[in-house]
A protein has these predicted regions:
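Helical mechanochemical/support elements of P-loop NTPase systems and associated helical scaffolds
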Residues: 52, 123-127, 153
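Walker A/P-loop-proximal flanking segment of P-loop NTPase domains
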Residues: 1-77, 113, 134
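Metal-dependent catalytic core segments for phosphate chemistry
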Residues: 75, 127-133, 138, 142
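Hydrophobic positions on the alpha1 helix immediately C-terminal to the Walker A/P-loop
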Residues: 82, 86
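Conserved phosphate-binding/catalytic loops and adjacent sensor/switch elements of nucleotide-binding enzymes
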Residues: 114-133
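Flexible phosphate/Mg2+-sensing switch loops adjacent to catalytic phosphate-binding sites
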Residues: 87-118, 139-154
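ATP-binding Walker
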Residues: 77-78, 122
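Catalytic cores of large soluble enzymes that bind and process phosphate-bearing ligands
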Residues: 41-48, 119, 123, 149
Protein backbone atom coordinates (compact mmCIF):
# COMPACT_ATOMS: atom_id res chain seq x y z
CA UNK A 1 0.00 0.00 0.00
CA UNK A 2 1.29 3.46 -0.90
CA UNK A 3 1.75 6.06 1.81
CA UNK A 4 -0.18 9.32 1.86
CA UNK A 5 3.06 11.10 0.96
CA UNK A 6 3.42 8.95 -2.16
CA UNK A 7 -0.20 9.41 -3.23
CA UNK A 8 -0.56 13.17 -2.79
CA UNK A 9 0.87 16.04 -4.74
CA UNK A 10 0.87 19.23 -2.69
CA UNK A 11 0.20 22.43 -4.62
CA UNK A 12 2.76 25.19 -4.10
CA UNK A 13 0.04 27.66 -3.10
CA UNK A 14 -0.47 25.66 0.10
CA UNK A 15 2.82 27.12 1.32
CA UNK A 16 2.02 30.69 0.22
CA UNK A 17 1.77 32.77 3.45
CA UNK A 18 -0.54 35.28 1.74
CA UNK A 19 -3.18 32.54 1.27
CA UNK A 20 -3.13 31.15 4.81
CA UNK A 21 -6.07 33.27 5.94
CA UNK A 22 -8.07 32.80 2.74
CA UNK A 23 -11.30 31.07 3.62
CA UNK A 24 -14.14 31.28 1.14
CA UNK A 25 -17.53 32.43 2.34
CA UNK A 26 -20.97 32.50 0.72
CA UNK A 27 -20.60 36.27 0.45
CA UNK A 28 -17.68 35.68 -1.94
CA UNK A 29 -20.05 33.66 -4.12
CA UNK A 30 -22.83 36.26 -4.12
CA UNK A 31 -20.41 39.11 -4.81
CA UNK A 32 -18.67 37.22 -7.66
CA UNK A 33 -15.27 37.15 -5.96
CA UNK A 34 -14.58 33.49 -6.80
CA UNK A 35 -12.94 32.42 -10.03
CA UNK A 36 -14.98 29.33 -10.96
CA UNK A 37 -12.30 27.87 -13.24
CA UNK A 38 -9.66 28.13 -10.51
CA UNK A 39 -12.05 26.83 -7.84
CA UNK A 40 -12.86 23.66 -9.76
CA UNK A 41 -9.26 23.18 -10.90
CA UNK A 42 -7.97 23.23 -7.33
CA UNK A 43 -10.77 21.36 -5.56
CA UNK A 44 -11.76 17.73 -5.53
CA UNK A 45 -15.40 16.73 -5.99
CA UNK A 46 -16.15 14.22 -3.23
CA UNK A 47 -18.90 11.62 -3.45
CA UNK A 48 -21.02 13.67 -1.05
CA UNK A 49 -20.53 16.84 -3.07
CA UNK A 50 -21.38 15.04 -6.29
CA UNK A 51 -24.58 13.68 -4.74
CA UNK A 52 -25.62 17.17 -3.62
CA UNK A 53 -24.82 18.66 -7.04
CA UNK A 54 -26.69 15.99 -8.99
CA UNK A 55 -29.75 16.15 -6.73
CA UNK A 56 -29.83 19.94 -6.85
CA UNK A 57 -29.52 19.99 -10.62
CA UNK A 58 -32.29 17.41 -10.87
CA UNK A 59 -34.42 19.93 -8.97
CA UNK A 60 -33.30 22.84 -11.18
CA UNK A 61 -34.21 20.75 -14.25
CA UNK A 62 -37.61 19.89 -12.75
CA UNK A 63 -36.71 16.19 -12.63
CA UNK A 64 -37.13 16.10 -8.85
CA UNK A 65 -39.48 17.71 -6.36
CA UNK A 66 -36.95 17.69 -3.53
CA UNK A 67 -36.32 21.35 -2.80
CA UNK A 68 -34.32 21.20 0.42
CA UNK A 69 -31.14 19.36 1.29
CA UNK A 70 -29.77 18.81 4.78
CA UNK A 71 -26.03 19.34 5.00
CA UNK A 72 -25.15 17.85 8.36
CA UNK A 73 -21.38 17.58 8.36
CA UNK A 74 -19.51 18.63 11.47
CA UNK A 75 -17.76 21.99 11.62
CA UNK A 76 -15.05 21.97 8.98
CA UNK A 77 -16.83 19.21 7.09
CA UNK A 78 -17.32 21.07 3.83
CA UNK A 79 -20.84 22.51 4.01
CA UNK A 80 -19.88 25.99 2.79
CA UNK A 81 -17.51 24.47 0.25
CA UNK A 82 -20.34 22.32 -1.16
CA UNK A 83 -22.73 25.28 -1.30
CA UNK A 84 -20.11 27.37 -3.11
CA UNK A 85 -19.54 24.57 -5.64
CA UNK A 86 -23.29 24.32 -6.22
CA UNK A 87 -23.63 28.08 -6.59
CA UNK A 88 -20.74 28.29 -9.04
CA UNK A 89 -22.19 25.52 -11.22
CA UNK A 90 -25.60 27.19 -11.07
CA UNK A 91 -24.12 30.51 -12.22
CA UNK A 92 -21.62 29.04 -14.70
CA UNK A 93 -23.20 26.32 -16.89
CA UNK A 94 -19.99 26.03 -18.93
CA UNK A 95 -18.37 24.02 -16.09
CA UNK A 96 -21.18 21.50 -15.52
CA UNK A 97 -20.08 18.85 -18.03
CA UNK A 98 -16.52 18.95 -16.71
CA UNK A 99 -17.37 18.87 -13.00
CA UNK A 100 -20.43 16.61 -13.17
CA UNK A 101 -19.28 13.95 -15.59
CA UNK A 102 -22.19 12.57 -17.56
CA UNK A 103 -24.52 15.43 -16.62
CA UNK A 104 -25.85 17.36 -19.55
CA UNK A 105 -29.05 19.37 -19.82
CA UNK A 106 -28.84 21.72 -22.79
CA UNK A 107 -32.12 23.36 -21.74
CA UNK A 108 -30.86 24.44 -18.33
CA UNK A 109 -28.92 27.67 -18.57
CA UNK A 110 -27.69 29.90 -15.80
CA UNK A 111 -29.58 29.41 -12.53
CA UNK A 112 -30.16 32.49 -10.38
CA UNK A 113 -28.94 32.02 -6.82
CA UNK A 114 -29.40 33.71 -3.47
CA UNK A 115 -27.49 33.02 -0.28
CA UNK A 116 -27.19 34.30 3.26
CA UNK A 117 -24.47 33.69 5.77
CA UNK A 118 -24.91 33.96 9.52
CA UNK A 119 -21.68 35.94 9.58
CA UNK A 120 -23.76 38.84 8.27
CA UNK A 121 -26.38 38.88 10.97
CA UNK A 122 -26.33 42.68 10.85
CA UNK A 123 -27.91 42.79 7.37
CA UNK A 124 -30.36 45.75 7.41
CA UNK A 125 -33.42 43.63 6.59
CA UNK A 126 -32.17 40.35 8.05
CA UNK A 127 -32.07 37.02 6.25
CA UNK A 128 -35.33 37.32 4.30
CA UNK A 129 -34.73 40.92 3.27
CA UNK A 130 -31.25 40.01 2.06
CA UNK A 131 -32.61 37.11 0.00
CA UNK A 132 -35.47 39.27 -1.34
CA UNK A 133 -32.92 41.85 -2.47
CA UNK A 134 -30.80 39.19 -4.22
CA UNK A 135 -33.77 37.85 -6.19
CA UNK A 136 -34.99 41.30 -7.15
CA UNK A 137 -37.93 41.49 -4.76
CA UNK A 138 -36.64 44.12 -2.33
CA UNK A 139 -39.30 46.62 -3.42
CA UNK A 140 -42.19 44.27 -2.67
CA UNK A 141 -44.64 45.19 0.06
CA UNK A 142 -43.19 42.42 2.22
CA UNK A 143 -39.95 44.35 2.59
CA UNK A 144 -41.20 47.94 2.51
CA UNK A 145 -44.23 48.12 4.82
CA UNK A 146 -43.62 49.25 8.37
CA UNK A 147 -45.33 46.12 9.76
CA UNK A 148 -43.21 43.73 7.74
CA UNK A 149 -41.24 41.21 9.84
CA UNK A 150 -38.34 42.04 7.52
CA UNK A 151 -38.25 45.56 8.92
CA UNK A 152 -38.47 44.55 12.55
CA UNK A 153 -35.75 45.79 14.86
CA UNK A 154 -33.21 43.21 15.83
CA UNK A 155 -32.63 42.59 19.52
CA UNK A 156 -29.59 44.20 21.09
Amino acid sequence: MNSLHELCEVREEVFDPSRRDTVLDLTDLIEDRINARRFFKTNYVTNGMETLLREAFDRFSRQSQQGTFLLNQAMGGGKTHNMIALGLLAKHPEFRDEVLEGYHDPNLGRVRIAAFTGRESDAPLGIWGSIAEQIGKSNSSATTTSRSPLRARRPG
